[in-house]
Amino acid sequence: MSLRFSRTRRAPRGFTLIELIVVMAIVALLTSIAAPRYFASLQKGRETALLSSLNTMRDAIDQFAADKGRYPDSLQELAQQRYIRELPEDPLTGSRDTWVELAPPSELQATGRLWDVRSGAAGRASDGRLFADW
């Protein structure tokens, strides 16, 4: 009697449930480590953009006051007089309408209604300061 061993190819098998669970756990662990850093870097980028916009507008206000001998009446006047190309978008609120325009202090005895500008965003920056105080 001869024994014949057949060499049949077995069909390729998929991953086991345990292997899939282990891979998903590793992916979840890596995501939980990376996601907070990603969102923190997005927030830091928005804060940097806010500082840049505020500095640009404040420089334009000062230049307007030096040229005209008075402060502008609004941010729109800065754009109309070409001291800024256009009113920037507040990176924290995503709107051009949330800028807070501050009038000159009474002790300056200055004309014009726009002395400083701040963000209208609520909350605190990553360093703990209020956005309203920037």
Regions found by a protein language model. Give the residues of each.
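Generic leucine side-chain signal with a strong bias for well-ordered alpha-helical environments
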Residues: L17-L20, L30, L50, L54, ...
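N-terminal single-pass transmembrane signal-anchor helix
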Residues: A11-P36
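N-terminal leader/signal peptides at the extreme start of proteins
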Residues: M1-R13
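Amphipathic alpha-helical protein-protein interaction surfaces
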Residues: I26, R46, Q80-Y83
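Flexible interhelical turns and helix-capping residues at alpha-helix boundaries
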Residues: T31, Q43-R46, K68
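Aliphatic-rich helix starts adjacent to a transmembrane/signal segment
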Residues: R37-L54
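Low-complexity, acidic interaction segments enriched in glycine
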Residues: N55-W134
